[in-house]
Amino acid sequence: MLLLKCQLASDMGCIRTNNEDMILFNGGLYRDETYEQKFELIPQARFTAFVADGMGGHEGGEFASELATQAFDRFITDLPCGLSHEVLSGEIKNWVNETHALITNKGVELPQYEGMGTTFVGMFSYEESIYMVNIGDSRLYRYRGGILKRLSSDHSMRELTGDMTTPSNVIYNSLGAGTSAFADFTELTGQLLDEDLFLICSDGLSDMLTDDQIEEVLQREPTAVSYTHLRAHETEA
């Protein structure tokens, strides 16, 4: 049984006039708000913690991130019990394809949303195991023993080519945009320690603060309330 202490926060930031991020946390969707919860994760329980960062201009990004988080919430709720890792991996692939098609088709049906898409990254529990799903360039970090480690990979042209002159926000994989999408799917169960702190964020944070700066903040305040300090540093950056 795991004791989880969670804090989530969604903030428009200092530049944009709308917030295209959406948080999925244990069946709830959150945008432009903060929320805290402490609970025990009992065996067989389904737990979700994800961030989706929409793109598409106007309100397209907001709509895409909402569609993706709603779709995954339905997926995890309806997922049958007793699936093997291999079968679960196949179900994740099916969900990615279906959700990509859903968002793409909505963009065709509603011209104001044409070309919209979203990243999607986070963790979920299933059958006493913890898994990571990653699509795009939003990030999942683990902080342990004073060291911050990025667990997700950016599906960006910069990371793919190693060319640092390429803008960091040029991505080649997302739900809705492009001809297809894929997900990195990884089991984390054997890598978990009681002391671990996980940070899930969009590029609204990771583009403003380096990994070293995030690590420095967490070293001073290694608890969920670190969000306040991270947000302050982001504003100063």
Regions found by a protein language model. Name each.
Residues 232-237:
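A short, hydrophobic C-terminal helix/tail in secreted or cell-surface proteins
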Residues 1-231:
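PP2C/PPM-type serine/threonine phosphatase catalytic domain
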